[in-house]
Amino acid sequence: CATNKDINASLLDTFIRRIPVKIYLPSLEDRFIEERLTLIERFIKDESLRLDKPVLVSKNSMIALLSYNCPYNVGQLKSDIKLAVANAYSDYFIHHKKQIKINSPDLQKDIKSSLLSPKEDALRLVDLMADTDGYFCYVNYDKYKNYSRALKFLLNYKTYLKEEVLWI
């Protein structure tokens, strides 16, 4: 089971004896910054796919996401990104903006506070990344969505034609 608690305190001894393999997965703090970036990008692209729109992330927001202390690891990181995207989408929808942009105000307070003392690795990594007007763009459209609609239409039309031929 995935936990950051002491397994001896939470699992029965008999259960532990029957499954003798222990796997150690490092926390986000113990991983390389590039791996954290990969996770952040994956979660933002997942939200982009869900919304069917590109999501842009400001440089400061990316630095904050790369720098903040995330005690509940990957699950918390994913939840925090979902909340940031939801806040950005709300701003996009209410103010009729052209794009969904994650800016510092869309982040939770503890994430924003990491901007006061960002990690050096995060600053270097963000400087190396290609951006457009201070934003990183993440798009993850279902490129086959429109094709599948057309295919369904053609299959239905083919069935319709077969039925018409049978009735003649």
Placement of each model-derived feature along the sequence:
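Structural recognition of the conserved hydrophobic beta-strand(s) that form the central parallel beta-sheet
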Residues: 1-4
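Amphipathic alpha-helical transducer elements in NTP-driven molecular machines
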Residues: 8-13, 33-37, 41, 59-62, ...
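Short conserved motifs of the RecA-like P-loop NTPase core
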Residues: 53-70, 96-99
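C-terminal helical "lid" of AAA+/P-loop NTPase domains
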Residues: 63-66, 75-93
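Flexible, glycine/charge-rich interdomain/linker segments that couple
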Residues: 92-108
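C-terminal engagement/docking regions of AAA+ P-loop ATPases
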Residues: 105-167
